[in-house]
Amino acid sequence: YNEGDKKFKIFQGGVFRTNETNSFKSLFPPSINHAISSRIALQVYQGLVGLDQRTLKVKPLLAETYSISDSGRLYTFTLRDSIFFHDDPCFDNGIGRMLNAKDVKYCFDQLCSAIDGNRTSSYLTGIVKGAKEHYNSTSNSQIVEGGVEGIRVVDDRTLQIELISSYSYFLKILTQACCAIYPKEAYEMYGKEMRAHAVGTGPFVLKNKDVNEDVEIRMVKNDKYWDVDEHGNNLPYLDVVKISFNNNKKIELTNFKKGNLDMVYQLPVEELKAVLVTLDSAKAGGNPEFKLQSNKDNGLSSAFYCFNMLNPIFQDIRIRKAFNLSIDREKIVKYILKGESEPAIYGFVPSLGEYDHTLVKGFSYDPELARNLMIEAGFKDGKGFPEMELDISESNYLNIIVAEAIQKMLFDNLGINIKINYYSLSVLIDKFTNAKSD
């Protein structure tokens, strides 16, 4: 802390406890394609750049600086000096070595390759020069000599990435967990086991290696971490982060009230009134049990349903439109989500910064038009239409009550029967990744 300035005194140490209502799928960066794995992995790994948690603007991480050519196609990154990987048996004498530009190229080449478990290659293959060709030429988990043409090591601290054309959002892609950097030695030693054996450069070190999905995760402070706060204090402040896995939001809230957890990500909607009395009362300090800290920015979360386009029924655009027009999004937001969301009537991307979502022609609630479309498709009042199955996460109460509302709307408006199936997140991801859901 700043000596003599009590306002900026920083307390070091302690254990931070939180819970996830779904288990993680994998902590191997190219395999990370959902939020829970990403939240955990980004405590252990880092990428060239990251997002500022308050402004959501891109900020340098492993890259100390970066520049963009006038054409917008060539990005040059200069790495920070003296950043080290976590100590791990994959290194000589178990001591983590210094990060260099070859590590970054190795990881990005992997991301653009057909290696086992790579679920995120599309982040770069359509953008980086030579990435698609590299992916198509890889097989049997082997990296082609020379790697991706557009990813070049200039020297130990300098890397260049050449794009096919200018992409304004390229830096934000690099903030994703799949673009995090890990050492070649770790992949060569652990292979598929990197799903739970993470070796990175981040503020915390994963201690319980080879954990199962439902076992508590324990991460300890990285004593060699490079970053400091605005006052020069070494980061992170915490000694330990513990993450448990319990899919019952009510039990999670009970543990929070008892002091067994330090944070919950979301309050169950049905518990909002009981916990906060009312949001207005809590903001005014009227609740003696909790103090409310409010962030008025939109959360980076969108909820949407996907059609399985391999199902012949949904290959008819009239049916897809009818489903869309039968859902009263504003009613769901007002009465089920208690106003704590925004109806996606202009596409599912909310207004952010300079982006005005009202320019998108979306779908408003129009059950009459929906019924006419179903008649055109040959399914008046739902007659002859097969029962559809909607697969959702079993651990998120909001998902369940929204799904039940949509189930009722589709039956009331179109006469369509929907069966809701509840799965763990890992099973759910497998089902929609392999087109096993409707």
Where are each of the predicted segments found?
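Extracellular/periplasmic solute-recognition and catalytic clefts
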Residues: 207-220, 244-310
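Ligand/substrate-recognition segments at binding pockets and active sites
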Residues: 353, 375-438
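Short, well-ordered beta-strand elements
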Residues: 12-22, 74-77, 104, 159-160, ...
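N-terminal lobe/hinge region of extracytoplasmic solute-binding protein
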Residues: 19-70, 199
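Structural transition elements
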Residues: 204, 314-315, 342-377, 394-402
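Aromatic- and charge-enriched surface segment that lines or borders ligand/interaction sites
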Residues: 64-123, 160, 252-255, 313
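Gly/Pro-rich hinge or "lid" segments in bacterial periplasmic/extracellular proteins
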Residues: 53, 133-157, 162-236, 240, ...
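A structural "hinge/loop" feature
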Residues: 22-38, 62, 89-95, 120, ...
